[in-house]
Amino acid sequence: LDELKKGVKAFADNLIKLKNAPAITEYYAGPVLLEDGACSSVFISNFLKRGALFAYRKPDTDRAQSVKTLDAPLGMKIVDNRVSIKNYSSLDKYNGVPLLGAYNIDAEGIVPAKEMTLVENGIFKSMLNGCTPTLYAPQSTGSSRFLLSSRNGMFSTAPGTIHIEVEKGTKPEKMKSALIKAAKEEGLKYAYIVRSLAGKASRIYRVDL
C-alpha cells in the first residue's frame, strides 16, 4: 500500500509540474537529446510498422490506404552501424521482469523462430511477416499476432519481444556534454532534452548554457 501511495503521489506531482511548466513558443533550430521514453517512441514510429521491420505488400488498388515504407532493400544500411535489433518469440522474462511478447505459435498456426536478427550492425537483414508473401519476405516468420482488443479473431504482423543492442554506447553524462558542446558551437543560448513524446504531455527540458 505504501508503494502504491508513493506511486500515486509521484504521478500527481509530475502532472502538477507539467501543468505549471512554461510552454515552448519560440522557434528552435539546434541539437536535441532524446532520452528515456522519447527514444522508444522514435524507434517505434520509424521501425516497428508495416513497410519497415514489418513486411508490407502494396495493394493492387489505389483505393487502399497508402503506407510509407523505408524504401530500403535488405542488405542496406538503415541505422547507425553500432545498432543491432533482434526479435525473440520465446523470451518470457528479462532480468526477472515478466514479458508479454512470448508465444509458441502465431495466429496462422506457424511456429516462429526463437531468435531472429532484423538489423545487424546497422544493416537491414530481415523483416517480420505473416503468410502473405512480399518482395523481401516471401515466407512467414510466424509473426501474425492476435489483436488484444479484437473479438473477431483479427490479427496483424507484430513482434514478440524486440531487443535493441548498441555496441560501445555512450553514457548519459557524455551525451549531455556533447549536446551542450554542439549547442555552443552553433552560438545558441540553450538546448533541449526530450524525455517523453506524448503530445501536450511531452516532457521537454531546456538546458541553459
Q: Language model features by range: what are they?
A:
Residues 1-209:
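N-terminal small-residue-enriched
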